[in-house]
Swiss-Prot record:
Binding site for Ca(2+) 2: D297, D303, D357, D359
Entry GO CC: cytoplasm; plasma membrane; presynapse
Start and end residues of each stretch annotated as Mediates interaction with STXBP3: 257-375
Disordered: annotated span: 38-123
Sequence positions that bind Ca(2+) 3: D297, D357, D359, D365
Effect of D303N: Loss of interaction with STX4 and insulin-dependent translocation to the cell membrane
Protein name (Swiss-Prot/TrEMBL): Double C2-like domain-containing protein beta
Binding partners and assembly: Interacts with cytoplasmic dynein light chain DYNLT1. May interact with UNC13A; the interaction mediates targeting to the plasma membrane. Probably interacts with the SNARE (soluble N-ethylmaleimide-sensitive factor attached protein receptor) complex composed of SNAP25, STX1A and VAMP2; the interaction is calcium-dependent and competitive with SYT1. Interacts with STX4; the interaction is calcium-dependent, increased by insulin and glucose, and mediates vesicle fusion with plasma membrane in pancreatic cells and adipocytes.
Function (record text): Calcium sensor which positively regulates SNARE-dependent fusion of vesicles with membranes. Binds phospholipids in a calcium-dependent manner and may act at the priming stage of fusion by modifying membrane curvature to stimulate fusion. Involved in calcium-triggered exocytosis in chromaffin cells and calcium-dependent spontaneous release of neurotransmitter in absence of action potentials in neuronal cells. Involved both in glucose-stimulated insulin secretion in pancreatic cells and insulin-dependent GLUT4 transport to the plasma membrane in adipocytes.
Residue numbers carrying Phosphoserine: S411
Membrane topology: Peripheral membrane protein
Subcellular location: Cytoplasm; Cytoplasmic granule; Cell membrane
Length: 412
């Protein structure tokens, strides 16, 4: 403590003032901060202390006496023990040699850390899980998607809940007809839809190259709908006519290759039935339905109808037209037309089927078409000959629409 003479005002140094505030009572010297935090290398405990020099009159220890029994593994620890002794002596005051240090406890093996890449419970906790099943009906060229339920979805609204729905998207394909969705369930994180959505016109080729994207979204009346999570199922994993059930963790949104979508985009599919009726002495052409049609209107839909034309037709009396279906890309027509013709003349004929978008006040838009007949190829030729060979038997086939028909009149 700083001393003062008689008559002088008492003064206290800053160090004494701090010591009094921190530790009332007798003032003791303030230790250096290094006394509280000695420097040791990481992983080396401060258990070793420097050995005091031996007194001059102490008998010298023989190397044999100073040596202790060692195991072969001790040799690998020589350097570590030397470092312990060296850094254990750092900053320590000299003193008598300590007694034998207690044996070190065996080091605990490091605990296994969760594998971030393979640890799925984080995503499950954050986004939720989805239960659904898929069935490919090979005979009817249909893919049935049953959306069962979801659990533990991520809250998206201010009330801590969500308004979830499920959206399906066949990839590749940018057409709006490739997208289907369930109804929306309000204020729930554990929705049960139990709803089946069906894609028609699915071929074996589609099952090899296409992938089904299943997204769970939150519907918002005042803003854009929000994405919650998704999963993707390559259709080649499915066996024909066999229901496969899934229970998966939703994942974060993955990018869609827009260039690939455009390059493989189609004009749509059409289901046509052919039958030569011996009773009516004519060809019965059935326009059953279309699927995945290209959108021609600004609202993202079309108002489609179908025309059929049996060529060549000198009198131009063979044109038939279905009714118009409003605002749809997957219309169902179920209409049939009869062409009176001898069976032997069919081999010389060509059936032209075109799909159009109806517009009021302007020209109708051509969506796509297909030609069946002697000059066709692949499935179109096979469908025509199967009809000729099997009288009085209705044969249905799906055909892909193209935007170019050689020799066709593409105006309505």
């Amino acid at each position: 403590m700083t001393l003062r003479r008689r008559g002088e005002k008492a003064t206290i140094s800053i160090q004494e003032h701090m010591a009094i505030d921190v530790c009332p009572g007798p003032i003791r010297p303030i230790k250096q901060i290094s006394d509280y935090f000695p420097r040791f290398p990481r992983g080396l405990p401060p258990t070793a202390a420097p050995r005091a020099p031996a007194p001059p009159d102490a008998p010298a220890r023989s190397p044999a006496a100073s040596a202790s029994p060692r195991s072969p593994s001790d040799g690998a620890r020589d350097d570590d023990e030397d470092v312990d002794q060296l850094f254990g002596a750092y900053g320590a005051s000299p003193g008598p040699s300590p007694g034998p240090s207690p044996a070190r406890p065996p080091a605990k093996p490091p605990e296994d850390e969760p594998d971030v890449d393979g640890y799925e419970s984080d995503d499950c906790t954050a986004l939720g899980t989805l239960d659904f099943s898929l069935l490919y009906d090979q005979e009817n060229n249909a893919l049935h998607c049953t959306i069962s339920k979801a659990k533990g979805l991520k809250p998206m609204d201010h009330n801590g809940l969500a308004d979830p729905y499920v959206k399906l998207h066949l990839l590749p394909g940018a057409s709006k007809a490739n997208k289907l969705r369930t109804k929306t369930l309000r204020n729930t994180l554990n929705p049960s839809w139990n709803e089946t959505l069906t894609y028609y016109g699915i071929t074996d080729e589609d099952m090899v190259r296409k992938t089904l994207r299943i997204s769970v979204c939150d519907e918002d009346k005042f803003r854009h709908n929000e994405f919650i999570g998704e999963t993707r199922v390559p259709l080649k994993k499915l066996k024909p006519n066999h229901t496969k059930t899934f229970s998966i963790c939703l994942e974060k949104q993955l990018p869609v290759d827009k260039a690939e979508d455009k390059s493989l985009e189609e004009r749509g599919r059409i289901l046509i039935s052919l039958k030569y009726s011996s009773q009516k002495q004519g060809l019965l052409v059935g326009i059953v339905r279309c699927a995945h049609l290209a959108a021609m209107d600004a609202n993202g839909y079309s108002d489609p109808y179908v025309k059929t034309y049996l060529k060549p037709d000198v009198d131009k009396k063979s044109k038939h037209k279905t009714a118009v279906k409003k605002k749809t890309l997957n219309p169902e027509f179920n209409e049939e037309f009869c062409y009176e013709i001898k069976h032997g003349d069919l081999a010389k004929k060509t059936l032209e089927v075109t799909v159009w978008d109806y517009d009021i006040g302007k020209s109708n838009d051509f969506i796509g078409g297909v030609v069946l007949g002697i000059n066709a190829k692949g499935e179109r030729l096979k469908h025509w000959f199967d009809c000729l060979k099997n009288k009085d038997k209705r044969i249905e086939r799906w055909h892909t629409l193209t935007n170019e028909l050689p020799g066709a009149v593409l105006s309505d």
